[in-house]
Amino acid sequence: MKVVQLKIENFRGIESAELKFDGHALLVGSNNVGKSTICEALDLLLGPDRLNRFPPIEEYDFYNGRYLQPAQVEGEDPTPVKIRVEALLTDLSAEVLKRCAKHLEFWHIAEKRLLTEGEVKAATPGISIPCLRLETVGEYDPAEDEFNAETFYIHSPDAIEGEKETVRRDIKRLFGFLYLRALRTGSRALSLERGSLLDVLLRLQKVRTGLWEQTISRLKGLDIENDAAELEPVLTAIEERLSSYVPASKAGRKTKLYVSQLTREHLRKTMAFFLAMRDDQEAVPFQQAGTGTLNTLVLALLSFIAELKPDSVIFAMEEPEITVQPHTQRRIADYLLTHTKQAFVTSHSPYVIERFTPENTFLLARAGSGKLEAMCVADATGLKENDYKRYSRRGLSECMLGKGVIIVEGSTEYHALPVLARCLEGEDSALNPLDLAGVSIFDAESDSQIPKFAKFFQALGLKTFGFYDVKQRDATEKAKFAAVLDVNEEHKYKGFEQMLAAEVPVTRLRAFLQDLLDSGVDAAHYKIPTTLPTDDAAIKKLIVNVLSSTKGAGWSARLLEQCQSSERPTTAVEFLKKIYTYFPLPVVTPATGASAQTP
């Protein structure tokens, strides 16, 4: 079972969205762009337990909290605004095909569209496949003063005209949808509350009825008072005083202590999952375990569920990387990709992002105030899949999540420019720090690769800034750089090291070299004379050789850290200042009165 189309209207922070998927989907984007809302919308539509809570939706489940449209004519009643979530499902299981047969339609495989009336010849294997369209509609009911939501079959041939048949809860269970809101806590996933992972497991194993009956029976037979003799006189005194106000005809004891209310619902809330992770450790409540252990335990439960329903599991999972080490992050991602029919994952981790192909990675962005759009990364032309995989963890993933990217051609610039930026930001409070602005630095490893990566980032909607060495280039080659860079900085030097040698004062260069000698560096290996030359030209030549060595990238950053404001390389400083103009500091109204006082 797979979701290939998803439409959302007036739900949470999304006024409208029409998304298309082909298998697994990694959802990336800035905070509050709508990643979690997509997962919540899927849960509203496919989750078997989501609509059974009361109320199923609330005021702020509506876009901007608007659940009533003001009347156009004075005196008329306002019109309820409707939440709509629609999905088209393919790869249906045999049981779904059987039980939902009259609601089936057909999906054209090659053209990726729904067959319409008059296309009966296309409804054949190889050309099209059966599909199922579902829709959840939620609205406010003024008459009852409550919010309602229901899921329907869009194709309902047997329904009364203008109406649709509802999707029952037992049918939704066949879809196998599981939504893990976050791995950051197992407090609900590892409880026995309705809809929790343990509850799902018990339902799949068909052991829930026996569990509750046997547990309630054993708890009834547990005599707490027998093991606590000091309770006897207290309970007797309570009964005597109670009889003074409420006559009781029951003979013998009228009060008794139990460890719970002896109901299923109360037991669901009170039963706890214990675990022990070491030989010297007694079992403790799972809440007392480390967060990383909890998250891994949740993954174990998910894998168990997937094994029980191998052909019909759709996972929606938020940020699986929370408090989990990198190798576990990769394992979680690999498991989802190989053991589920479809997985919807939100993540900011390069270790998770690198596991998804460009075809399965979607960058979410706002087109206007409430419209959400998703761009498939594979559609960002100019970057081969091998390049995507190679550079994914080396900065590509971070850049994709930002608003701008500085593309450089080597490790020296990659390490030095962030240091220079921090120095400028530390001295000028009017500058918006690049980290906060969402600007990353990406090492393309050579100037020839800058246009390729810039084109990729530009297609994703990022601002692109290039900083590279001078070189003999014809007009066509120069045009490639200019076409994809918002700031196209080809400086006049043959290398970043030459720029530092030319623009940083010689006194600072000499002091830096002396500092290296004093730190105990292997002077012979790096060809630094123990007595520095007095000639300025010799110092500049020496600094170029030293910074071009294997440790040169880190040393270039170290040199810039030691520079005073007037000693910094003008070319690099002016380049960064151009970038700051694209990301002005947000205006913050200063606090006044008592709130402005420091406690």
Task: Go through the PLM ranges and name each one.
Residues 1-47, 273-398, 570, 581-599:
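Switch/communication elements of ASCE P-loop NTPase nucleotide-binding domains
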Residues 19-20, 30, 75-80, 125-129, ...:
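Conserved catalytic network of the ASCE P-loop NTPase/AAA+ motor domain
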Residues 24-27, 178, 405:
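Conserved beta-strand position immediately N-terminal to the Walker
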Residues 40-128:
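Conserved P-loop NTP-binding catalytic core
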Residues 81-85, 130-134, 173-177, 312, ...:
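Short glycine-/polar-rich loops that comprise or flank the Walker A/P-loop
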Residues 92-211:
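Electropositive, glycine-dotted interaction segments
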Residues 189-192, 199-297, 301-313, 476:
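Extended helical coiled-coil dimerization/tether regions that scaffold
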Residues 394-407, 411-599:
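Acidic, Mg2+-coordinating catalytic modules of nucleic-acid enzymes
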